[in-house]
């Protein structure tokens, strides 16, 4: 049926066919992940973090292979050495439905174990609901009445992360998938309380302003921890299923993922940190915008 749709609508790149193939590929990943998770439960290994991280890595690797085979994506990772040894907080750009998958694949390929701050709604995914809750992640309840409890739970993720621990904590500090309308609303909201900050962020063209609460919770709980900035291009416009359809119709193209590490001694404390984060975010925005223009 998908092939018929593509032929009737004269879609040369077969977007419907590609989406259906990837849906089947994803179904295989979900089924396999749940079977292995069930086997670990039966064997009394529900608390075996190493086994579950291995499962996560295999799951992510299978799905990224599916993106190559079914969607025609090519993937290049730059600066992967920044992940070596772990012991850091990863601040990642957020623009598509595949961002957490992309980062999980890249990080586990380096032999590092990622802990995630994700929205609770993602627990609708069966594998995340089972495996994600067995690992030290935090699924954020964005409607929680007590934001302090949520921030405390986020901070707990870095409290035992030591240098060379082989562990990183990943957060998407924009708080939602970026697009131009959200960017305008975010800057306007900041302007209500901090005109100075809004003025320096008005030049953003690809990223959203950082929502600092979660990032501060992670950094405050582990003073001196290194910070890794993760930027990627190639998934822009794929923030909705309709967006994925449009991208597939025109071609996914190359996906580039880059990591840059900043040692903890260079990360400001207190009130100076937000201006520093904003400046680094503006630098990332400029690089992302440059890459997008070249694609």
Can you name each region flagged by the protein language model?
Residues 147-160:
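A Trp-anchored, charged/polar loop motif used as the substrate-binding/catalytic surface
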């Amino acid at each position: 049926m998908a092939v018929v749709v593509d032929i009737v609508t004269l879609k040369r790149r077969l977007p419907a066919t590609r989406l259906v193939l990837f849906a089947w590929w994803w179904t295989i990943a979900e089924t396999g992940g749940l079977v292995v998770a069930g086997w670990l439960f039966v064997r009394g290994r529900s608390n075996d973090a190493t086994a579950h991280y291995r499962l996560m890595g295999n799951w992510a690797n299978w799905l990224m292979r599916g993106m190559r085979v079914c969607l025609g994506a090519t993937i290049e990772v730059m600066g992967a050495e920044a992940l070596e040894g772990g012991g850091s907080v990863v601040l990642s750009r957020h623009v598509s439905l595949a961002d957490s998958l992309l980062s999980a694949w890249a990080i586990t390929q380096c032999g590092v174990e990622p802990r995630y701050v994700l929205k609770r709604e993602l627990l609708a995914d069966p594998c995340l609901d089972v495996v994600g809750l067995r690992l030290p992640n935090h699924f954020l309840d964005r409607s929680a009445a007590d934001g302090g409890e949520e921030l405390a739970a986020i901070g707990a993720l870095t409290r035992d992360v030591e240098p060379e621990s082989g562990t990183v904590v990943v957060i998407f500090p924009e708080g939602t998938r970026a697009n131009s309308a959200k960017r305008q609303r975010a800057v306007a909201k900041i302007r209500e309380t901090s005109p100075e900050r809004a003025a320096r962020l008005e030049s953003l063209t690809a990223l959203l302003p950082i929502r600092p609460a979660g990032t501060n919770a992670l950094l405050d709980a582990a003073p001196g921890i290194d910070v890794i900035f993760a930027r990627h291009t190639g998934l822009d416009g794929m923030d909705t299923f309709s967006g994925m359809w449009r991208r597939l119709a025109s071609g996914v193209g190359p996906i580039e993922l880059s990591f840059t590490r900043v040692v903890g001694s260079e990360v400001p404390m207190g009130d100076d940190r937000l201006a520093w984060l904003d400046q680094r975010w503006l630098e990332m925005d400029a690089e992302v915008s440059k890459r997008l223009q070249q694609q």
